[in-house]
Amino acid sequence: MARTTLLLLSILFLLPTNAAIKKLQVEYLTNPIGLDTTVPRFSWQLESAERGVRQTAYQITVATDAACLNPVWTSGKVASDESLHICYAGPALTPSTRYYWKVTVWNNKTGEETSTEKAFFETGLLSDGWSGAQWIKATQINKNSKINPEDKKQTKARMLLEMDVTLTSGNASVLFGARDASNVFMWSVNTLDNEKEPLIRRHIYDRGRLQSSDTPIGKFFTKSDLLNKEHHLAIEAKDGVVKTYIDKVLVDTYTDTDSKLSNGYIGFRAFRGNNTNETAMFDNIVLTEYEQKGDKEEAKVVLKEDFEKPQSAFEGGEIVSVGGNRKLNMVSGSGDYRVLQVDMSGVPMFRKEFKAKKKIASARIYSSALGVYDLFINGQRVGNKMEDGSIRYDELKPEWTDFSKTAHYQTYDITDLLRKGENAVGAQVSSGWWNSDVCHGEYGSHEVGFIAKILLKYTDGTSETVVTDLSWLSSMDGAIRMGDIYHGETYDARKESAWTKPGYNTANWNKTAVNPYFKGELIAFAGPTVQVRPHLSRIPLSTTVYQGEKDGKINVVSITDKPAPIRLKKGETSVYNLGQNMVGWVRFKVKGASGTEMKLRFGEMLNDTGDKSRGDDGPAGSIYTANLRSAKATLKYILKGSKEGESFHPSMTFFGFQYCEITASEDIEVLSLIGEVVGSATEEGASFVTSSRSINQLYSNVMWGQRGNYLSIPTDCPQRDERLGWTGDTQVFCRAASYNANVSAFFEKWMRDMRDGQRSDGAYPDVAPHSWVGYGQAAWADAGVIVPWTIYLMYDNKKILQDNYASMEKYMEFLSRQKGDGYNYNGAGTNYGDWLSYEDTERRYVSVCYYAYTAQLMAKISEALKTDDCDAYASKAKAYRKLAQEIKKEFQTRYVDADGDLEQK
């Protein structure tokens, strides 16, 4: 006991007695760059080994020199114990400028201390703008061509497209003349939309605008003639006339009077939704293009595909065997699903070479995308250099916003990546949350886009900018063939190249064009970014290899109980158990022959019995994926054949899983595999341990649920075809989330999504960012009031109340108009009510209760914002208290009987 006491006393003597100022932050971030706020907020923490030390005053100094000798602003000594959300109150900040700051703190015991941490923040573009930077998109027009990508009347189509088609349900849709996603012709053999006879439905997408028209073909074929039988389809385009033949019968003639159709790429479409289910099979595809040479017409077959080889000319779809013939089977799980030629279906890449004429003092890149993007300078991925020299990468940027109103841009310090002389910048952009199924068409189906501005500051005090314009080049022939939030990623390592380095051969690269589709506001991202969180990575607990099934169970070949290389033969399946339901992806290293295709699928659990009547979708021990619904959640990796092995992780998607299944077209050796957790890097500030294993597991489940579902936005689930920002789920869990981690800035961003999605009548959306379903539903729309109040309550964050007050008032006005059934206070809509309750609760009862609650909160919010008892906020607080009482009074009349019991109608 004496030894223990002496040891404790020794430790105490070693601790500093003076207070220390730690964790200096601006806008909840340590040394952030690229802030667009004109009034940044400062915070710090006071640490001391002595009990009872507290701050009594502070003084903040902001300067453009690291020593803070020439202040831009000083707060002066302020008598206050506040150390959070202290607002800058100096002269207007200059765009693209680094400001250093320090704070001096007086405390009640040890006197005065000044911070020693190197603390700074850097402004973004503010009102300085983008210096002429344009949103650009990829084209299929070679850089040396004289064709203007913006001119859609160039090069009239002269081609013949033939194929065998088996229409199995609904419609069979063929794309042709495709220059990009927004400029394409699509002809559908349609058996759904006319009760009497089938149609040829013509869809023409011109710069994203759709024109459609129909030709009935009942005099040639009935619906029963067309369904479930193979037919030969031919589409011929010459001299501005498009003729369509079925089994050599001319069924439709269309005149392209505006010359919109040109020779281009082809593809196929399947659609499911709105009582429509299109499924069809395609085979023996031949595309012939014609060129006039003098008096003769020369025919050239540019595509021939019968799907008999392991890899086809098309990216996606399912290859099935019918009567010994392999066919492309087009099926959509949900929404619009398109399969395009490999040459045009890769993820768009953009590049630019530029020359730094002088020695560089500093360099920044400001960039964003319509889609999910990654960024490279001189062959290096762009990220944030940390104090220890490591690089932290932001993933899935620019993250999800309501793209009809807002997009984020990122800022990176690229000084160390550049050099005097020749440099290259590259970006690749996938569909992300811009035009994929997760958006449900909310922002259109336009091509992805990219914008960037590089600011070079030279040592002689001069500066120069490089911006996105039509001098940039594009290609769709890179290694990332497909990237989609729901469906996964396809990566062909054989297509890797040095495209992000200077001097790269761009002979086969194409022009860019202006991407005109974003009409919103481009603002700097501020908050916790989506990152890989290394401390949460998972190694496999076990790996099971099996081949086929036996008696309803997987036929096990081997089980490995520790991480080890796994030799996987063609026809075998391996299942990795990561031991924890997580959100992110896997990073693996593999050896195998060039061209071998690995297919990785992800699931949260295994089939336990193999009994389909119990809901299993495979033999016992295989991964269960039925809960993914239409989300394919699949990673495909095509090996380049490196003898040393090749490492990979995806970058354009994420998965919710505990189990990873791997199959391969040829024998491979998986040298290693780990699960990497990906999510918004909110700083976790709590831990909780009890003597109860069950309670500890419950807490663990809560933490892992938050880590997984807080990815850019607060989602409802991370794995299936949903992953949406459901507002009801969010307001219920927001308080708990605030105890677990610092989510203040996370929710400041999300509340902007709510405001962007708010309808003109004041109703908040069911999901934010708005991409689906409705508006103005009780307990869901009320999140627009509940979440700001919760964040204020937990963090003393008045800014979130100030930013959203006008929006919240607009919502309260919406509620005030919901009168009916003889009542004045009905609250919001009743689509959901007491969602998933075991016992039914009257939905109007729920909405009235929430109306009273939001009125009470609005009174408290107004009180929090008032500066004196006579200002506008004080008056509004009084009005909302009165409203809450009136709702309560009507509620009692409506739901409380004479005995004082609650009674639902």
Tell where the protein language model's regions lie, with residue ranges:
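Sec-dependent signal peptide recognition
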Residues: 2-8
